[in-house]
From Swiss-Prot:
Keyword Manganese included in the entry's annotation: yes
EC code: 3.1.26.4
Function: Endonuclease that specifically degrades the RNA of RNA-DNA hybrids.
Principal subcellular localisation of the protein: cytoplasm
Organism the protein comes from: Staphylococcus epidermidis (strain ATCC 35984 / DSM 28319 / BCRC 17069 / CCUG 31568 / BM 3577 / RP62A)
Gene Ontology BP term (one): DNA replication, removal of RNA primer
Cellular location(s): Cytoplasm
Protein name per Swiss-Prot or TrEMBL: Ribonuclease HII
Gene3D superfamilies with a match to the protein in the record: Ribonuclease H-like superfamily/Ribonuclease H
GO molecular function, one term: RNA-DNA hybrid ribonuclease activity
Originating gene: rnhB
A GO CC term attached to the entry: ribonuclease H2 complex
Keyword annotations from UniProtKB, A to Z: Cytoplasm, Endonuclease, Hydrolase, Manganese, Metal-binding, Nuclease
Domain RNase H type-2: 72-256
Cofactor binding comment, as recorded: Manganese or magnesium. Binds 1 divalent metal ion per monomer in the absence of substrate. May bind a second metal ion after substrate binding.
Length: 256
């Protein structure tokens, strides 16, 4: 008696390589449901392989450092929140375990909210060290966004329980006595920076959701402080709060 299509799908789901899939006896089954199941599994295997290859490519900076110092404590640093009209800029500093394996890790802007939340939880439970640094909207107005971002990053590093031996930073340099590499679009090129990007994004989004409970009219839970139509309308109707950046346009002009 032949297996049902459901049973064949279950067997196919355990196959991890294209070679194994192409050799499977299900390829001799002419039923349309089985043919579609094989195609679907092939697509999923190819997708997983692409994720694995991308993950390996994102380890190049870490591997170069580790090749000369196997005991290096490599810290990835990234920030979230430079562009919004409200809320802090949040940085995260992350030191991954040596044998890390977080498939799907990428620039937080490229990861779906569901996968970002899953990765964030996995990272928080398994990384060697992580810490956050925040620069408030007041500090952003006083310093400018670039310097406030540097401040948030330095605060994150200083919150770690260990001192990193090398910093991998997304497109910035920091005034700190630790060897560092600044990488343009680093959150898409370094697994350590990508981890920091994910964790900073999740932390800031949660902060803005909490802020939205106090000030629901601005829609912070949906816009994260960016200048959406709803947000700008609320500013025009009820004014600003301390979390708004008064040095940012159009708020700066609206305050005159």
């Amino acid at each position: 008696m032949s297996l049902t299509i459901k049973e064949i799908k279950e067997k196919l789901s355990r196959i991890e390589t294209l070679e194994e899939l192409h050799k499977h006896e299900a390829n001799n089954d002419s039923r349309k449901g089985v043919i579609n199941a094989i195609k679907s599994r092939e697509k999923n295997i190819l997708k997983q392989q692409a994720l694995e290859e991308h993950y390996l490519s994102m380890n190049q900076y870490e591997n170069n450092i580790m090749s000369s110092n196997r005991d290096a404590l490599i810290c990835g640093i990234d920030e979230v929140g430079r562009g919004p009209l409200a809320g802090p800029v949040v940085a995260c500093a992350v030191i991954l375990e040596k044998n890390h394996h977080y498939i799907g890790l990428d620039d937080s802007k490229k990861v779906s909210p569901k996968n970002r939340a899953r990765l964030n939880q996995n990272l928080k439970e398994n990384v060697y060290q992580y810490a956050y640094g925040i620069a408030s909207s007041v500090e952003i107005d006083e310093l400018n966004i670039y310097r406030a971002t540097q401040l948030a990053m330095l605060r994150a590093i200083n919150q770690l329980d260990v001192t990193p031996t090398h910093l991998l930073i997304d497109a910035m340099t920091l005034d700190i006595d630790i060897p560092q590499t600044s990488i343009i679009k680093g959150d898409a090129k370094s697994v350590s920076i990508a981890a920091a990007s994910i964790m900073a994004k999740e932390y800031r989004d949660q902060y803005m959701r909490q802020l939205s409970k106090q000030f629901p009219e601005y829609g912070f839970d949906k816009n994260a402080g960016y200048g959406t139509k709803q947000h700008l309308k609320a500013i025009d109707q009820v004014g600003i709060i301390n979390e708004h950046r008064q040095s940012f346009e159009p708020i700066k002009s609206m305050m005159k």
